[in-house]
Amino acid sequence: MGFLKGKKFLIIGISSVRSIAFGIAKSLYNQKAELGFVCQNEKIRKKIKKLVEPMKSCIVLCCDVSNDKNIKKLFIDLGQVWKKFDGLVHAIAYCPKQYFNGDFIDNITREGFNISHEISSYSFIGLVKACRTMLNNFSSLLTLSYLGSQRVVPNYNVMGLAKASLEASVRYMASSLGKENIRVNAISSSPIKTISSYKITNFNKIRNCSYASSFLKNSVTSENIGNVASFLLSDLSLGITGSVIYVDNGFNVSSMNNIQ
């Protein structure tokens, strides 16, 4: 019997079979969780329904997280199927491609700053705020981050600021929701090949550098991340909240580890 049997989780931001969210969904499903999915719009809904069909979910909803009315409608629609659920995975990030290149100060604009923070950081808070009353006791909430929140990564630029904001929101939401026995955590992973990652100039060089300086010499996969996510969403991790858990083969604590 899976350790998530009887629990219901909403996966927000799944986009393709290569997305981290898909790896998390597979792991949750393998542990017998019941899943619901949220994609960006009707244009890709049919594709996502086909993608998650093996996970036997009847819930594939759409939501534009930049719009509060859309977020409210999302949970009204979800409430027609689930009155209560046990947590969500926030796998949403966005920054226009032109900001993933060149000098940080030269390239940043007010518009780029605002949209990166609104979609990548505030959306997690807005979603949780809207569904708070639907969350069961001992629910668990999870988001995805990256080391660029703590260190300068070439070309990551304004997204590093947005991820730092996201990680701060994890701590503050953990404080707000602790009295309701609801936990909030983040996973910070190695660079993973996804559709979104190729917006970043020289992504392969960044990925190769991470690999060369990591202690473990195997590539982190979305399934690896999914297994950690399953643990954090389960009752096996009841004592963990407000934390950023690194799934990066030790890269976040390494220093010139590739020098022989």
Curated annotation (Swiss-Prot):
InterPro entries, alphabetized: Enoyl-ACP_Rdtase_NADH, NAD(P)-bd_dom_sf, SDR_fam
Protein function: Catalyzes the reduction of a carbon-carbon double bond in an enoyl moiety that is covalently linked to an acyl carrier protein (ACP). Involved in the elongation cycle of fatty acid which are used in the lipid metabolism and in the biotin biosynthesis.
Protein name: Enoyl-[acyl-carrier-protein] reductase [NADH] FabI
Coiled coil: none
Keyword flag Aminoacyl-tRNA synthetase: no
Keyword Lipid biosynthesis: yes
One Pfam family per UniProt: adh_short_C2
Assembly and interaction partners: Homotetramer.
Gene3D superfamilies: Enoyl acyl carrier protein reductase (1.10.8.400), NAD(P)-binding Rossmann-like Domain (3.40.50.720)
Catalytic activity annotation: a 2,3-saturated acyl-[ACP] + NAD(+) = a (2E)-enoyl-[ACP] + NADH + H(+)
Alphabetical keyword list: Biotin biosynthesis, Fatty acid biosynthesis, Fatty acid metabolism, Lipid biosynthesis, Lipid metabolism, NAD, Oxidoreductase
EC supergroup of this enzyme: oxidoreductase
UniProt GO MF annotations: enoyl-[acyl-carrier-protein] reductase (NADH) activity; identical protein binding
Residues reported in the UniProt entry to bind NAD(+): 13, 19-20, 40, 64-65, 92, 163, 192-196
Active site positions: 146, 156
Pathway this chain belongs to: Lipid metabolism; fatty acid biosynthesis; Cofactor biosynthesis; biotin biosynthesis
Site, as annotated: Involved in acyl-ACP binding: 204-205
Alphabetical list of PANTHER family matching this protein: ENOYL-[ACYL-CARRIER-PROTEIN] REDUCTASE, ENOYL-[ACYL-CARRIER-PROTEIN] REDUCTASE [NADH], CHLOROPLASTIC
Homology family: Belongs to the short-chain dehydrogenases/reductases (SDR) family. FabI subfamily.
EC number: 1.3.1.9
GO BP terms, alphabetized: biotin biosynthetic process; fatty acid elongation
